[in-house]
Amino acid sequence: MSSTDDRRFEVLRAIVADYVSTQEPVGSKALVERHNLGVSSATVRNDMAFLESEGYIAQPHTSSGRVPTDKGYRQFVDRIADVKPLSTAERRAILEFLESGVDLDDVLRRGVRLLAQLTRQVAVVQYPTLSASSVRHLEVVALTPARLLLVLITDSGRVDQRIVELGDVLDDEDLARLRGLLGGALDGKRLAAASIAVSELADEAPEDLRDAVVRSATVLVETLVEHPEERLVLGGTANLTRNAADFSGISGFPGSLRAVLEALEEQVVVLKLLAATQDAGTVTVRIGEETQVEQMRGTSVISTGYGAAGTVLGGMGVLGPTRMDYPGTIASVAAVARYIGQVLAER
């Protein structure tokens, strides 16, 4: 890349930095005063004219300054050489906060809350997809002789508890037999296979246990099926309202805050964006129209996968206006995802 291209990128970088910081369109005079670009005001004006002609910056109707376009942000993100890492103290605080989680739900909710605080954006995490999980253990506990508690634990740390009302009472020997039948059908199987196995169990069960097996199997099949409405945790939605001007049109962004909030309510939209994240070691940045979601044309989504023992369990990330601190947000998303995976792997 030529020295002229490098210089123009430095001008673009300065425009992005100032606009993200001030939310005000940036003029050439301000750039020269705030940044050590090493060139004259005339050169900066010429470079800004070139950047505008190439679609990297644009002029809002209400100002003489310029703001980055989606194309400009993309160029900036693609050329970020160094993402500022979090400090040792920040990393330690993240890990300690996540390690205090009592179970999978608590760890994920802590992760979302933390990510929203670090980035000042909307944070989102996808629960581990059941298709990637296996049954680690099924515990069957008699609450009364005619009522059972089933506790299903997956290898991703998910714990589901369900009550089964029996038609007949079970003594300790029958309970042990039922526990053996259910556990033998489920333990170690992927959840899709486990659902099939437990459905077929009624045909193989001894006559005296068949009713208890059918009732238990019915509850377990419901537990093993994906429930999309339960698969997403959001945090920091209020951060969107703090950035409401970014969605009002006065800053040059299409779309509206209401449209973004409606998209968040339709969790399937966000799930599709996170589902495209398959690598726990790579952070993906989608800017504006790259989200391919009409209501979210004025937003950016920064996401990655999280997992344990080499398996990606789900996706997580942040969503906010295209005017965001990309280097800091990328670092925060990567760190929180990495430490969630580390905490889950140790459980």
Curated annotation (Swiss-Prot):
GO biological process entries: negative regulation of DNA-templated transcription
GO terms of molecular function: DNA binding
A Pfam family this chain is assigned to: HrcA
Keywords: Repressor, Stress response, Transcription, Transcription regulation
InterPro entries recorded: GAF-like_dom_sf, HrcA, HrcA_C, WH-like_DNA-bd_sf, WH_DNA-bd_sf, WHTH_transcript_rep_HrcA_IDD
NCBIfam families, per the entry: hrcA (TIGR00331)
Family, as annotated: Belongs to the HrcA family.
Physiological role: Negative regulator of class I heat shock genes (grpE-dnaK-dnaJ and groELS operons). Prevents heat-shock induction of these operons.
Annotated protein name in UniProt: Heat-inducible transcription repressor HrcA
Native source organism of the sequence: Rhodococcus jostii (strain RHA1)
